[in-house]
Amino acid sequence: NDYYDVNLKNNRLKILQQYDKFTFQKQNLEDKEEIDRIFKKNSPNRVIHLAAQAGVRYSIEHPEVYIQSNIVGTFNILEGCRHNKVEHLVYASTSSAYGLNTKYPFSVHDNVSHPVSLYGATKISTELMAHSYSHLYGIPTTGLRFFTVYGPWGRPDMAMFIFVKKI
């Protein structure tokens, strides 16, 4: 999509392609048949699922993108894990899950039933789906609630990137 310049992702990819065991396949997570094919072809023991449509502001104007990528896409990953006997799934969530909580610091035990963005709601949904798959199908899962991720390859819409660029 047009969320930000695709060249940033392509430049990140060039760094990873230097590693012999790294492979890259560009696929839409919501394409269940293609995700199934990738799981069958590669037979992974462990899956690290970091793909998602990120960003709170973009979710206000493009909610369908978040439902498809985050919820449907994660469902397809979970199904791939279930049908291919994956030993462990690590997936990305977000600090947006904490929504209207006012207690600081946040805790994994805090209530997350009041998201204030569709983005946060989709990521909470993926956490609940992963928890259900763990319980129903015995797939160990670990969710990571990332806060603001920054660095030289950070997303250009993030405050830190904007501030540094203006200096």
Which role fits each region the language model picked out?
Residues N1-V149:
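N-terminal Rossmann-like NAD(P)+-binding domain of SDR-like oxidoreductases, especially those catalyzing
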Residues L78, M160-F161:
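Short alpha-helix within the catalytic core of nucleotide-sugar-dependent glycosyltransferases
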Residues H135, F161-I167:
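Alpha-helical substrate-binding/gating segment
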Residues G143-F146, W153-M160:
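Conserved loop-to-helix N-cap of the C-terminal "lid" that shapes the substrate pocket in Rossmann-like
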